[in-house]
Amino acid sequence: MSYSYAEKKRIRKEFGVLPHILDVPYLLSIQTESYKKFLTVDAAKGRLHSGLEIVLKQSFPVESKNGQYELHYVDYQIGEPTFDETECQVRGATYDAPLNVKLRLVVYNKDALPNEKIVEDIREEYVYMGDIPLMTTNGTFIINGTERVVVSQLHRSPGVFFSKDDSEEGAFSARIIPYRGSWLDFEFDSKGIIWARIDRKRKFCATVILKALGYTQEQILENFSESKTITFNSKGFALRLDNLSNMKGELLKFDIVDAQDNVIVKKNKKLTSRDVKKIKDAGVDSVAIDFDLVSTLRVAKDIVNEATGEVIAYANDDVTESLLESCVEVGMLELEVIDFITTERGRYISDTLKYDLTRNTDEALVEIYKVLRPGDPPAAASVKALFEGLFFIESRYSLSDIGRMKLNARLGSDKVSKDIYTLENSDIVGVIEELINIRDGKGKVDDIDHLGNRRVRSVGEMVENQFRIGLYRVEKGIRESMSLVHKDKLMPKDIVNSKPITAAIKEFFTSGALSQFMDQDNPLSEVTHKRRISALGPGGLSRDRAGFEVRDVHATHYGRLCPIETPEGPNIGLINSLASYARVNDYGFLEAPYRKVVDGKVTDEIEYLSAIDEDNYVIAQASTKLDENNHFVEDIIQCRSGGEAIFTESSRVQYMDVSAKQMVSAAAALIPFLEHDDANRVLMGANMQRQAVPTLKSEKPLVGTGMEKIVARDSGNCIIARNVGEVAEVDSNRIVIKVDTEKSQTSNLVDIYSLTKFKRSNKNTCINQRPIVNVGDKVEAGDILADGFATDFGELSLGHNLMVAFMPWNGYNFEDSILLSERIVKDDKYTSIHIEEFTCVARDTKLGPEEITADIPNVSESSLAKLDESGIVHIGANVEAGDILVAKITPKAEQQLTPEERLLRAIFNEKASNVVDSSLRMPSGTSGTVISVQVFENDKGGKSKRALKIEKELIDKARKDFDEEFAVIESVVKSSIEQEVVGAKIQKAKGLKKGAILTKEFLATLPLSKWLEISFEDEKLEEKVQNAREYYEEAKIAIDAKFEAKKKSITQSNELSPGVLKTVKVFVAIKKRIQPGDKMAGRHGNKGVVSRVLPVEDMPYMEDGTPVDVCLNPLGIPSRMNIGQILEAHLGLASYGLGKKIEKTLEKTRKAAELRKTLEEVYNSVGDKKVNLEALNDEEILTLCDNLKGGVPIATPVFDGAKEEDIKSLLKIGGFATNGQMKLFDGRTGKPFDRHVTVGYMYMLKLDHLVDDKMHARSTGSYSLVTQQPLGGKAQFGGQRFGEMEVWALQAYGAAYTLREMLTVKSDDIAGRSKMYKNIVDGKLTMNVDVPESFNVLRNEVRALGIDMDFDYSSEEE
């Protein structure tokens, strides 16, 4: 096994028995692939049947009303974005690119005859159709400067669905759901009548739809019912027994007798195959029936007197005596009737026709029109147009390829081509037939929660739909413009207005329910957000109406949606996460991978199955035992089939799971020993990992699952090498790789990677990248070059490994509280940097422009000390609450001054009185360091000094960066040819003769540009130098062009909102240490609040004097059933012990041979998966050992983790007791505790619920407008609510004065509180109470009812 650059530095020991069959696919592919499919930029490769291309093709051509103009679509191009991703975030712009569509305007001769079209002119040009947001490399969008994610939606797939309602009768219904257009429902009522509804409007008979389609009453009966022939004569009535085989399984309503009157089959018996044979053998072809039975029948076809053409009876008329007499009169002695005798099947449609009052197609169309447009008078043309537009015109109704596939599959017919996306007559007939079959018990209703009936709508499809909406509006505009514009040389540009497209797309990205502000607490929360599947949103469910069934875990979720990871609140089960190996197929259905089993042998061939396909197969679990030839060891094995868990013979198995972790999501797959935890706690664990705050120093988990590196790699937060090469330069801002062009498929000699430094994330955490490579290191493509935030050597690192003791300590871990050691605070283990952004906007007001200036009236010099001359705070200044960040003055209305004041103003030249200080100040409860300032101005007033200074710094930095980049390219070009040219014969060189030998000394005097002008006699060498010269010149031109582009984007004017003159953004870094009140958690749902930080000397300690870091309450485990944390602690202790063992060996010797022996014991003595130490050279072994001192990292994959024996063996090697317990001593007394305590290493996270963000106190502040009571909440600087129950408490204690204070001066007694404030200032401690404002509100509300309520001011004596 080969190891990557980062893995060699710290190899993770892997447990687990199952072989590695398939790599976890790229985690963000659901986003990137979907949007790529939408844009399909590369037209050369052929654009697919989706995305922009198909929408444009469907919308064009557009024809003018008079037929003179036609606008055709030809092609489209997507331009280059104005700013790059970083620039967009800084400027608050949207990362998008212009869409230019090539349109062809065909002009026809208006004088031509009506039926002929003569082309007069064709005009073609590219038309701007708005800006399309582009996706970043990490699957996000930058909209107005913020990163957003479009969450995929799980919605009901288009197609037909049959269901049964929950009422006692259990009425059956069918619903045809298109991708776009009207819904069509058919439903049975309790009487067996079939009703239809369009778009859930008023119901009407289902046969009305059939008549509207052009079917006659006779044809409808023929389609849906069998007919039988009855003969009659003077002896009575007889029923012909033809198609006997169709009667199998039906209940007989009469005896069947032979010619000798022997009963062959008795009445009320179900007919079997044997009975049919008996009847045939007896030669019985008809059976006598009585008139009572005949009178229940109905006529199957119209009965016409052939002689006169008179209609005796219509199809579906009842068979009556008078009808039979009429038949006899005209000599008809046999009658074709609907078969109600041998089957009930035909009765449903027959009964429905009885209710249906329409007689023909026209009447049926009018009936449908009345239902859809009640109150509108039906006109013949509009009636037909409405009905056809509902289901038969592709621009208004589309099943889409998915709907057509599902409809054909459900009805089991391929009569309709899969390219027809509208409804056909056979579809509607087929749906009604299937509904009747289901009612008769011959079919099954659909399970709406089955993932075969729900599909994923990803970002590309949603943007495509928005684009279609915008384009539809543009199309209407084009038609209007064509008829209004009268220009001789009309061009496509003149008639296309692209604003509706831009508006539709902008609305979707800014205010759509599924376009969300990216969760960016840490890399895992980013990845999980992009892999989220929501059932909410437009076209989906609403959380109020979603029942238990929709939210529940379904058998088809296996390997597709994670059964664990979902929110805990009202959205539980409606928001899911994609399972680790799942993917979305072309139809939008979720697929899971399986290994194919052929003749009892499990192959390595992988097949992806959708939920529909999977129902038909028997699938074995990943953990099923196989022999060395990949055959099943056991004869009877546990499998899944049709949604059930079964035990079956191994010979029946057709597929096998790929991996044990394929059932869970990426977040759940990060939890070691997941299989030993209760599911409710795992849900919390998976959700809380997403809330972990990245700390100052990242530390890998000692006990992981092997999924850490995959999440870190795919999150896009690490820098990954693009090509093979050698590290040429490293500093904190960039890494330069000299590319090995022979091994890499690229002509670039140099790869330069810029690192992100101290960037603010969406959650105000700090994004910072650190290089992990050194100059001279050899790297392969795909190796990690730099760690991002919350990663350590390319592994996800959300928290820290702490030594945990499960023991109570003086009540400080009551109810899940956590007791922490002071060492953790001193070592800055959980110290995190948070970057807050403060914005100050100077606007143009009615009274004049606001101004950002350091000259502010009535503000002390000390308050302005941290500002520069422009009135903006310096970078590096330490700011406290209340400090001015940006000094700003706002003009206020002129005041009328007295003559004395005017005189004084004139004497002292005071003019600042007509402005008010509206500076941006640091909010209460925060302090930090200013790390960055950005100034945006419009061009009107010229740029301020600070803006010019920032601009100059950015341009100088860019120039320095590009110069350094060019210097690297120069050195690489030099080193690539230097060895070969030294000692070569010269053809031509300035300062040397022809044929002279080139020396190193001569080269040292020349710059590289002069080197490359020398020509050589050796042709091969000359060619190599020529190539180097071309590369050098191209690189120089490219770098100059890049610099100019960067300079242009830096100096480019800013588009500020209307009325805004200047915007200043100040970024302040705030350092937060862990403290009591902060929330912490493990990975098993074990969460708690820090109750106390205890001095190290008071913490319990081991026999060797090592104090523990954390004390956790052991009572938090039994009731919660998350035993995984105990196993993690044991394995963590073993890992720590192994690290100590390596450290001791290092102290004795640094010889690689000795170290290899220790490493061999540590890595390869326990567990099935061995580490190939031979692949590492001696230097790498030494580096590895140095990195393992703190503990040997271990991977225990979910459902395939370390066993109890493995943990015991490792504990033994690490030098600990195999039960993981030890004697601890009290740090305060030095005495041992009464019994041994479980001690181990657990990975703990600090969550984004920090006490600093929640702690809040109010003195005086803002009040509510109506009630005049203080506002609530920290954001409003509000007060604490003294509610109803608290009032009762004070009443119960008789605390009258306290109660009066609470309900008046501290709340809404306006006069009383201002008097109180004055009294406190004056040093008087008295309280004057007035009427609370809420009483006035009540009084006014009562007055609004017409009752005058007021105080009775008269004295008692009166």
Curated annotation (Swiss-Prot):
Catalytic activity: RNA(n) + a ribonucleoside 5'-triphosphate = RNA(n+1) + diphosphate
Enzyme Commission number(s) of this protein: 2.7.7.6
UniProt entry tagged with the keyword Transferase: yes
Entries under InterPro entries matching the protein: DNA-dir_RNA_pol_bsu_ext_1_sf, DNA-dir_RNA_pol_bsu_external_1, DNA-dir_RNA_pol_su2, DNA-dir_RNAP_su2_dom, DNA-dir_RNAP_su2_hyb_sf, RNA_pol_bsu_bac, RNA_pol_bsu_CS, RNA_pol_bsu_protrusion
Keyword annotations of the record: DNA-directed RNA polymerase, Nucleotidyltransferase, Transcription, Transferase
Superkingdom, natural source: Bacteria
GO cellular component: DNA-directed RNA polymerase complex
Enzymatic class: transferase
Disulfide bonds: none
GO biological process: one example: DNA-templated transcription
Gene3D superfamilies registered for this protein in UniProt: 2.40.50.100, 2.40.50.150, 3.90.1100.10, DNA-directed RNA polymerase, beta subunit, external 1 domain (2.30.150.10), DNA-directed RNA polymerase, subunit 2, domain 6 (2.40.270.10), RNA polymerase alpha subunit dimerisation domain (3.90.1800.10), RNA polymerase Rpb2, domain 2 (3.90.1110.10)
GO molecular function: DNA binding; DNA-directed RNA polymerase activity; ribonucleoside binding
TM stretches of this protein: none
Subunit details: The RNAP catalytic core consists of 2 alpha, 1 beta, 1 beta' and 1 omega subunit. When a sigma factor is associated with the core the holoenzyme is formed, which can initiate transcription.
Record family assignment: Belongs to the RNA polymerase beta chain family.
Biological role stated in the UniProt entry: DNA-dependent RNA polymerase catalyzes the transcription of DNA into RNA using the four ribonucleoside triphosphates as substrates.
Protein's recorded name: DNA-directed RNA polymerase subunit beta
